[in-house]
Swiss-Prot record:
Oxidoreductase listed as a keyword: no
Subcellular location: Secreted; Target cell membrane
Described purpose of this protein according to its UniProt entry: Antimicrobial peptide with inhibitory activity against both Gram-positive and Gram-negative bacteria (E.coli (MIC=0.25 ug/ml), M.lysodeikticus (MIC=0.25 ug/ml), and V.alginolyticus (MIC=0.25 ug/ml)). Does not show hemolytic activity.
Post-translational changes noted in the entry: Contains 4 disulfide bonds.
UniProt main location, coarse: secreted
Residue ranges the record assigns to the propeptide: 46-71
UniProt signal peptide: 1-11
Keyword Kinase applies: no
Domain of life: Eukaryota
Entry keyword set: Antibiotic, Antimicrobial, Disulfide bond, Immunity, Innate immunity, Membrane, Secreted, Signal, Target cell membrane, Target membrane
Protein name as it appears in the record: Equinin B
Length: 71
């Protein structure tokens, strides 16, 4: 699974938080988890959420990670 690596301490915290969050949200769906983690990182690191979702245009769930539903 490709996870965005960030060298800052903040990035490590985001990675742990997002991996835990997305594993709970998408326990059986690797694609869901991957999208969730990518979005979660964007929010966590303060990037524009729209840019995090550009490669997922077919995915209608462009919402805050804590509202992300498992499908």
């Amino acid at each position: 699974m490709a996870v965005i690596m960030v060298d800052q301490a903040e990035g490590g915290q985001c990675q742990r938080k997002c991996l835990g969050h997305c594993s709970k949200k998408c326990p059986k769906h690797p694609q869901c988890r991957k999208r969730c983690i990518r979005r979660c990182f964007g929010y966590c690191l303060g990037d524009e959420p729209q840019q995090m979702a550009l490669d997922d245009e077919s995915d209608p769930l462009v919402i805050l990670p804590n509202n992300y539903n498992d499908y």
